[in-house]
Amino acid sequence: MQEVIQVNVLGKDDDEEIKIYELESLINTAGGKSVAFVSQVVTKVNPRYYIGKGKLEEIRDLAEKLEVKTIIFDVELSASQLYNLEEELKLKVVDWTSLILDIFAQRAHTKESRLKIKLAQLKYQLPRINKWFAYLSRQAGGIGTRGPGETMLETDRRAIERDIRSLEKALKDIEKTKRINRKSRDNIYNISLVGYTNAGKSTILNGMMKLFGSEKYVYSDDLLFATLDTSTRRLDFSNTKVTLTDTVGFIDNLSKELNDSFLTTLEEIKFSDMLLVVIDASNNIDGQIATIDKSLDEIDIGDKEIIYVFNKMDKVEDPTAASLYKREYERIFISAREDEDLRSLKDEIVKVIKEDYKQVKMHIPFANGAVLDYFMTNYDILKTDYDNEGTIIELEVNKGDYNKYESYII
């Protein structure tokens, strides 16, 4: 396990303890171990090093004492800042964006997510090439290497730009396929689990699968970004069939490259009928909701049903504090490891879904037996009758099926 020193850059209103914990958790998720931390309140960014020169001395002395070779910052550094810091410290420097991209690369399991991570890495790398090649040229001796270095730089830049175009085209092709797949499940109620990292989304999905489904579990661990790829499972809630999608968690301070890496998740959210916003009730409720609300506003989720799920209530010292949190949406308080709580969540979901159902009477000709089979399989039929031409059924249908089969309604 690689030992590192973490550097936390604080704004005047930041909570130092939370910032330290978040970066330490990310380092742990990446497979490293934070052996010390250095913090500095920065009101004006040093364009050369981001932090002050005095802090650099402190970091250098600490690294020498602990024999640490890697420093990790919790901010995104410019190409010149990365270069200057490594030159000054003679140590490897990793910034916030590079750290998270590394975690994403470790945890990407589908073709789409791997392509997205590669694209984000290339877009992150492109503006930094100049400084990297300058550094390599100096290591090689400087004089006599400038021409070849510049040629190599231009060749590498063109190669990266070519790879970016190729990846963007491949991702567009994947999106076309996904659009077709979404259409194939238009008549199933689609629900997405969204929330902060490590809030318990995968635990909820796994619990729901155990109680109401039969497919494999989703990887779940006490790590930030344990889920990178979106994972969709089908569930049967008492003849109400739904898909439930687990997504990578939200987090603050994401660069454009990292936001692009979230597109898989964000696109699934857009095509959902309902969002389950999962909140870790034991940790900074206001901060989580602020991050989630901001992200949902940015992706324009439209008019969707939303249930706020306050999870980990078993870890809350004062349960009344969470229950007093007022939202304009439905809310429920659970511990995702308790089956009874998950059944209560299922009941709440079904209640909200049913509010969108309409009771109808349909006449289905005998020649359209497949349509009748569909409703018999997927709905509770309230009443059945027959005439000389077909079957008459009464039932409650969802909005999608109401629109699709409106011609059968009498």
Language-model-detected regions and their locations in the chain:
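N-terminal accessory targeting/assembly segments
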Residues: 1-102, 409
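Conserved beta-strand segments of the P-loop GTPase G domain that flank and frequently precede/overlap
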Residues: 6-10, 37-40, 72-74, 276-280, ...
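Flexible beta-alpha connector loops of hexameric P-loop NTPases
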Residues: 11-14, 47-48, 107, 152, ...
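Conserved C-terminal guanine-recognition region of P-loop GTPase G domains, centered on the G4
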Residues: 22-26, 60-61, 77, 82-87, ...
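Canonical P-loop GTPase G-domain recognition
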Residues: 92-98, 102-106, 112-141, 302-307, ...
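Alpha-helical coiled-coil heptad-repeat register
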Residues: 116, 123-126, 130-133, 154, ...
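Conserved G1/Walker A P-loop phosphate-binding module
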Residues: 139-256, 269
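NTP-binding/hydrolysis catalytic cores, primarily Walker-type P-loop NTPases
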Residues: 355-410
